[in-house]
Amino acid sequence: MKKKIIITGGLGYIGTELCKLYSGISWHHKIIVIDNRFLSERVNQIQNWNMEFIQGDILDKKLIERHCADADVVHHLAGVTNVPRTKSESSITHDEKIKKVGETGTQNILDVISNKCKIIFPSTHVVYEGINEVKNNIREDEKTKPVLSYSSSKALNEDQLKKSGKNYIILRLGSVYGYSTDSMRTDIMPNLFSKIASQNGTLKLFAGGRQIKSLVPLIDVARCFKFMEEKNEINSEIFNLTKDTVSVKEVSEICKKHNPKIILKETNDEIPNLGFSLSNKKLLNTGFEFLYNLDQNIKEMIEKWSSQNIKKDLEYVKDGEKLFKDERGTISNHELTEPINLIGLINSKKGTIRANHYHPQQEQKCLFTRGQIIEVFQDIINPNSPKVTQVVNEGQLSVIKPNV
C-alpha cells in the first residue's frame, strides 16, 4: 500500500539518516521532508531520492495542516537540539524557545493528523535526569523526573501524545552516537571523545569517569523509526531505545584502544549525578535487532577524523569549499569522479526560455560560469513524479539525471 510519510526535522542528525533509509523505497511512497533550514546539498540529495522538501516551521499550523492532514505516518523529529545541560547554561529566552517549539509544534501536528495516522516521536532518557541515586534497567512505566527545560518539554510531549487519542509510538532515546557525513554532532560524549582521540588529545574524566551512560548507535535509531512505521500491529506504546550501558571511563578506554597516543586524565570535578540506565527488554521483544556497536562506531569516527587534512599555518589557507570569493576574484572547484564522454557550451540570452533534451542513460552536469537560471525538472518515465524547481547561480553545478 502506498503511504504518505512525513519527516519533520529531516535535515537533522537523525532525520538525515532516516531519509537515507527511505531513499530505497521513495519511488513507492510519497515522502515529504519538512525542516525550517535550507541546506542546499542535503535538499538536492533529498530531491534526487524522489522526496519532496518543504522549508517550513512546525509552529506554522497552516503549513503543517496542508501537508500532514492526510498523512499515514509522521516521524516527528523537529525540535531544538542546542539545549542546556546544566542550570548554569540555561536562560529564560532559550528555555521559552525549547518549550514553544517542543510543545506548540507537537500540538500543531496532533491537532491536524487523522486518527489513522501513526506518529513516531523521539523522547529522551534525560526525562530521568532528576534521579539522585544510580539506578539501572529503568523500565518504560517508571515515573519520569525531568529537571531542565529540554527534559521537561519532552516529558510534557509524552503526555500530549498519550492524551491525544492518536496512534503514537514514543521512543526514549539514549545518547545517540555515530559518524554522519551530513549532520555531525560533537556535543555527544562518544562523538566528542572520538574527535579528541583523532587529534591525539587528552580525555578528561570528571569524577574519575564513573558516570553511567545509556547510549544508542545513530543508524540503529533511524532503523528503529522505520521499523515502527512498518509494524502495523505496534500501536500506542513507549519503548526505551538504548543499546549500550557503559561508564564514561569505559568509553575513554575504547578510544585509547584505537589510538594509544591519547592521554586519559581523571579529575575530581563534580557531576550532576552518577547516571542511570534504561532497560531495552520491551523493545527487543518486538523483534527489533541492533546491528551496530560502540567499539566499531568509535573506531570509524577516529579513523575518519584522523584522515582529514590538517591546515598548514604557512599563509592564509581556506579549503573544503567548492566556491571561494574575495576581493581578488572567484575560484571554484568541482570534482567529476566519472568519465566524461561529451563536453560543450550553453550560452543563453537573458529572458529566454529553453527546453533541454533528455539523456536516456547518461547524467548531464552543467557548470554555470556566469549569470543565473531557473530550472524545472520532471522524470518523464513516471508521469506522476513531482516537478522540481531550482535556482542555479554563478559557480554552481546543475545535475540532470537520466530520463529527466
Which residues make up each language-model segment?
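NAD(P)H-binding glycine-rich loop region in Rossmannoid oxidoreductase-like domains
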Residues: 58-101
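C-terminal substrate-binding subdomain of Rossmann-fold SDR/epimerase-dehydratase oxidoreductases
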Residues: 201, 206-322
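Conserved metal-binding segment of the jelly-roll/cupin
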Residues: 392-404
